[in-house]
A protein has these predicted regions:
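Alpha/beta-hydrolase fold catalytic core
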Residues: 1-28, 49-52, 90, 156, ...
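Short beta-strand/loop motif that positions the catalytic acidic residue
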Residues: 181, 187-189
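Catalytic histidine-centered segment of alpha/beta-hydrolase-like enzymes
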Residues: 219-231
Length: 243
């Protein structure tokens, strides 16, 4: 594992990353989802796509990368781009899972690979709506441990900065960003995904002009069992984007 210090808005971020096939010229950037880290992505794809230099990055606040700022998705994309600039590389393909899919979309790489990407606002179940309403009612009273009782599972145990960041990105509508994308997009989705349901993938694929949609068996982490198919599809469909 290596690390690189990036300065963004006068704040220093120490970013942990790992390279696979470092002698290759074409670059595949792989970004994990919220609450995850580079290791699960490397586990899936580290032994695939041998013609690419893989960059597995812990985004700020995850894995072994630091974060002491309240961020939004645009901030993450700018930090990742600064990281790539610091490495002196240009990514041909950006692959992102869940939250990482939104960040990858903003990088405007020639080829974009979305794995159950976030970015489409879903209708909250009634129970969640009640929870939110109750939280808003109790918050002004200053009751202790309210945050612990009502925080989403994806945000538990986080620092204040990461919790506020989570609130910034969790229900973010990214339809305009997907529509504006000029990348060639391959959209892979788990048919049984409940975090980013299948219909959200269909919608994203419809918004990105140059896209192909692949529904596959599995849940939010379907790619762990479909890595070979995904790698083969990337090889076939992204080759014309390689300069």
């Amino acid at each position: 594992m290596a690390s690189k210090e990036i300065i963004y808005k006068e704040q220093t971020f120490k970013l942990a990353y790992e390279l696979v096939n470092p002698s290759q010229d074409e670059v595949l950037l792989v970004l994990h989802g919220w609450g995850s880290n580079k290791e699960i992505m490397k586990q899936a794809f580290g032994n695939t796509l041998p013609d690419f230099k893989h960059i597995y990055l812990d985004m700020p606040g995850f894995g072994k990368s630091s974060n002491e700022m309240i961020l939004n998705t645009v901030d993450y994309a700018k930090i990742v781009q600064l990281f790539l600039d610091e490495l002196g590389v240009t990514a041909t393909i950006a692959m992102g899972h869940s939250f990482g899919g939104k960040v990858s979309t903003l990088l405007n790489t020639p080829c974009l690979v979305l794995l159950s990407s976030a970015g489409i606002v879903t209708v909250k179940p009634w129970s969640v709506k009640v929870k939110i309403a109750t939280f808003k009612l109790l918050k002004p009273l200053g009751m202790k441990k309210i945050r612990e009782l009502f925080v989403a599972p994806d945000a538990q145990g986080m620092s204040h900065e990461m919790y506020e960041t989570f609130k910034n990105v969790v229900d973010e509508d990214f339809e305009a960003e997907f529509t504006a994308s000029k990348s060639k997009a391959l959209c892979f989705w788990g048919k049984e995904d409940t975090a980013t349901p299948l219909y959200t993938g269909e919608k994203i694929a419809g918004l990105i002009e140059n896209s192909v949609f692949y529904p596959l068996d599995g849940d939010h982490f379907f790619f762990l069992t479909h890595k070979d198919f995904i790698a083969k599809t990337i090889t076939e469909h992204c080759k014309e984007t390689i300069q």
